[in-house]
Amino acid sequence: MNIVGVDIGGTFTDLVGVIDGEVVTSKTSTVPADPTAGVAESLRLAHCDPRRLAEVLHGSTIAINTVLERKGAQTALLTTRGFRDVYGIGRSNRIEAFNLFFHRPKPLTRREMTFEVDERLNAAGEVIRPLDEQQVEAIARRLPERGVEAVAVCFLHSYANPAHEQLAGEVLRRINPDTFVTLSHEILREFREYERTSTTVLNAYVGPRVRDYLGTLETYLRRENFGGKVHMMRSNGGVMSIRKAQEEPVSMMESGPVAGMIGAGRLASHLRIARCIGFDMGGTTAKASLITDGMPAVEEGYVIGTAASGQPMQLPVVDIVEVGAGGGSIAWVDHTGGLHVGPKSAGADPGPACYGKGSSDPVVTDADLVLGRINPERFLNGGMKLDVAAARNAVHEKIAKPLGLSIEEAALGIATIADSAMSLAVRAVSVNKGVDPRETTMIAFGGAGPLHAVNIARQIFIPRVVVPKVPGTFSALGMLMASWRQDFVRTFIGRIGSLDAAAAERVLAELADEGRTQLKRDGVSEQGADFRFFADLRYIGQEHTLPIRIADAGMLTGDASVLRELFHVEHDKRYGQAALDEQLEIVNLRLVLTSARADTIAEEWMAQKWWPTEPAAEASRKVIFADAAAPVESRVLWRPAMKPGDVVVGPAVIEEPNSTILIHPGDRVTMTPTGHLVIDLTFED
């Protein structure tokens, strides 16, 4: 079966495909104004004929960028009367208590675009006041004159009974059939009014833009006589149908980055690495995620933007920490003479100064070029020649001259600050979670990841770095290994020890039925599907929960001794203590439904024996490393010419078509039998 994975990032569009049993790759600049053009060009460069493809897997930053850039649809919000300000007020706590410049999340829809409706349910879903359909109809008729493109509907307690939302949705869609309508129960059947409202608004806000983009992508593929399926990468680490993505685009917020972490998990399993940190550095951002036993952690919530003032999203998402430091991150000097890198990025257009597209702002890639770390003749496998003079001039004018430094000193400062910022992301997923980084391995990928990984690993004492095959397009490869996945949740509150067993059984059965319906809708066979149930538990009086896997409702009833023990162990692991005498409370029941891919050739290829594909070639050049006072003469090797068992001791640079690997003095790199590079770091006593 011929399949391709296409990852559209802020700077580059990457493709990995399996065509007639062979793996092909390509990397091209993203076209911000028309992302589909990048998809078309990546297919052309990889010699992939859409007519011969059975499946396209796709990840994109379009949803999250729409939020970060605040370029979403004009959105209206319908709420229960008396609850108009839930979304605007948010939570009363200050996440950053001592930040004098703290500000709350800015709502994506204005207060005057929030409409109250007469209706009311109690917490059990029983009707207190019927929905006033005439009010909904009157509101619907006023929306076009206000330029509304999308509507979010979030009624109180609709997670327990969606009937009122369903009626409101029917009215809205009948009167304004072209308006994108999101009903909260279709996205999230879970309590927490503010987070549920925020998630619903997010889906509506990005919906029209994502729907139009995916429609354009489908049109292009059909025009090219593509007759296969399109699946989208979702934030929980699985894939979904393109139809589901158009209905639930909020699930695509981290669709590109999580694919790389899925691939890193598969590689860790192949290399028998129990605990590793996936590190992905692209052109716009750098990402890190903790991976245990081949699986990245999944959290039941996420904040888009900064933790303090971003937009809450209460959906499962792979636990990724992201910082605005990538190859295209712009370096700048503030009014006090302080040097900064990012978060603003030069993107694909105009890109770094060395691209020769007219930019005069120095970025991390320009600094790496000045330091001799990048070969200007071999960038993108020779497809783009880099302008060293333009890079040096940008660093000189914007950084070196204002700070009274040499060009090389300024470039080293840019690279050092970028590495320090990225090391914070790695710390956040290791040290901050009680994991000793000295007991982990870093798996580095992304176009710029292998160039900076060793120095970042050294800063926090990670002893080993692994650079996989095709690191520059590794996220696209990860898509080919992702399973179909859908998460379902129901709020179900009760004290462990006195639960209604029949009610718990009924909720689990409803979740299973909903899962089977979604499998059928997406054309996925139930045979081989994995139904995993979880209970969200907490000590009574706590605010947040921990998910504990359950086999059936029987684990929740009686004294539930097994469940209690599992929770205490997990609580101790997460927080360093367990209150063994405290009562437990269940809050939600969950179903995680997955179906593994039938085609495993991408995983098999990652474990295939490596053979050199090009004749041996070696050169040397001067490179400036971190903390180095002067350039160091370094070996330069071409990765496609290396053989399994080859050992290289730094200083060295290993180049390959879509990435560059920097080996610091004294560090030792070995090529595994399957072609992956293992770098063992040396540390001063």
Regions found by a protein language model. Name each.
Residues 175-199, 461-477:
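Conserved phosphate-binding/catalytic loops in two-lobed NTP-binding clefts
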Residues 60, 155-156, 184-186, 235-236, ...:
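Glycine-rich beta-strand-to-loop/alpha-helix junction loops that act as flexible
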Residues 134-142, 273, 283, 291, ...:
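C-terminal, non-catalytic interaction/recognition modules in large multi-subunit enzymes and RNPs
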